[in-house]
């Protein structure tokens, strides 16, 4: 590949090497982009970064050479131990020495301000070097290499903490309700399901806060004593009989407390109750329960209801027990015995219970009665034959 390039360059001089090149030709002089060489040389001398040598280019190996060097020097400098032929004697650049180690290549960072050479060297470093600092190192390089970051040491957690501090809920009281160390200013309670505030901003427990909200006054600290029963009020005695126990305390015309008995007696008779009527115990009525009369009426109704079906059943049975009219010549041989059994069954049914129904309620036709006791001769013959079979 490089041989082909070399062969192509050896065929003849380049277009810009001859006398009729673009920069020295007459057509180039009339071109708008044409720059005379005198102006170029003056511009090159005025530029600080293209000067031959200076205090600012001491650390760079490239700064020791001129940009526009001679052809012979350029050819020897461009090919230090290489087989590449020279390209152009006019526009050639000097090459840097071969890089042997990464530390040999250094890049200097210079400030455009007017700083001395020592100051520039202080703030310049190579690729493998570190900045020089007047302060001591926080930790040694060995410790820094062996240090491993913890799984919780990340910038995300720090951002979350800062965000939590900045984005605090505006209603701070809502979060402060769960804090410890509060005390109710009224009752001194340390714990409550809900902390409240009074009109002045002091903290109240839930009970004191609700009491203050409903009644408008502070909740009393001492619970009121339970009201004693009327029969055992402390310090009360009847002004008439001087008793201390009663079911109901009353007042007389003078406003003095009296027992229930003396008060009723005075109200009914208009005179004070005599002391001879005083009793040790309190007489109470033996009141009957109000549901007792209702239960009795219910039992009476149930008894009457239980009797009515039996009477109706006996009437229906009596109607069913009535004999059926039979023609005189077709009476069965067991008619007489059947009538007796029916009569006995009817007597047992009617005699059930306390009620008794007489036999005349059963009406029999005279024809049937005559037929039962006076059968026809044909029926008698059949009846006799049947009796003979039974007796045999």
Curated annotation (Swiss-Prot):
Chief localization: nucleus
GO biological process, one term: positive regulation of transcription by RNA polymerase II
Function summary: Transcriptional activator that binds to the consensus sequence 5'-AGATAG-3'. Associated with cardiac specification and can regulate cardiac-specific transcription during embryogenesis. Activates the expression of cardiac MHC-alpha in vivo.
GO cellular component terms, A-Z: nucleus
PROSITE patterns with a match to the protein in the record: GATA_ZN_FINGER_1, GATA_ZN_FINGER_2
Residue ranges, compositional bias (Low complexity): 302-316
Entries under SUPFAM superfamilies matching the protein: Glucocorticoid receptor-like (DNA-binding domain)
Protein name as annotated: Transcription factor GATA-4
Tissues in which the protein is found: Expressed at high levels in heart, small intestine, stomach, ovary, and liver. Found at much lower levels in lung, spleen, pancreas and skin.
A molecular function (GO) term: DNA-binding transcription factor activity, RNA polymerase II-specific
ZnF locations on chain (GATA-type): 184-208, 238-262
DNA-binding found in the keyword field: yes
Gene expressing this chain: gata4
């Amino acid at each position: 590949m490089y041989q082909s390039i070399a062969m192509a360059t050896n065929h003849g001089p380049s277009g810009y090497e001859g006398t009729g090149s673009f920069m020295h030709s007459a057509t180039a002089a009339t071109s708008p982009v044409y720059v005379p060489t005198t102006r170029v040389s003056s511009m090159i001398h005025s530029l600080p970064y293209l000067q031959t040598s200076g205090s600012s280019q001491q650390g760079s190996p490239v700064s020791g050479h001129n940009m526009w060097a001679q052809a012979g020097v350029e050819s020897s400098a461009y090919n230090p131990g290489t087989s590449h032929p020279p390209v152009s004697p006019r526009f050639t650049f000097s090459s840097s020495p071969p890089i042997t180690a990464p530390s040999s290549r250094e890049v200097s960072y210079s400030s455009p301000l007017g700083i001395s050479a020592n100051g520039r060297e202080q703030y310049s470093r190579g690729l493998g070097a570190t900045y020089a600092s007047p302060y001591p190192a926080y930790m040694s390089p060995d410790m820094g290499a062996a240090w491993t970051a913890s799984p919780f040491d990340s910038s995300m957690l720090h951002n979350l903490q800062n965000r939590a501090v900045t984005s605090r809920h505006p209603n701070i009281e809502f979060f402060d309700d769960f804090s410890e160390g509060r005390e109710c200013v009224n009752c001194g309670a340390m714990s409550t399901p809900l902390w409240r505030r009074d009109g002045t901003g002091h903290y109240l427990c839930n009970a004191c806060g609700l009491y203050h909200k409903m009644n408008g006054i502070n909740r009393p600290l001492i619970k009121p004593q339970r009201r004693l029963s009327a029969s055992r009020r402390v310090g009360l005695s009847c002004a008439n009989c001087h008793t201390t126990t009663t079911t109901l305390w009353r007042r007389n015309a003078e406003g003095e407390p009296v027992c229930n008995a003396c008060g009723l007696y005075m109200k009914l008779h208009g005179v004070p109750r005599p002391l001879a009527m005083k009793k040790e115990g309190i007489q109470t009525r033996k009141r009957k329960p109000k549901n007792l009369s209702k239960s009795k009426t219910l039992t009476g109704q149930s008894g009457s209801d239980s009797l009515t079906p039996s009477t109706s059943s006996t009437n229906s049975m009596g109607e069913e027990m009535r004999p059926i009219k039979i023609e005189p010549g077709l009476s069965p041989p067991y008619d007489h015995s059947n009538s007796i059994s029916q009569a006995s069954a009817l007597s047992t049914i009617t005699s059930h219970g306390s009620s008794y129904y007489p036999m005349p309620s059963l009406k029999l036709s005279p024809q049937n009665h005559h037929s039962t006791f006076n059968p026809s001769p044909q029926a008698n013959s059949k009846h006799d034959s049947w009796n003979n079979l039974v007796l045999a």
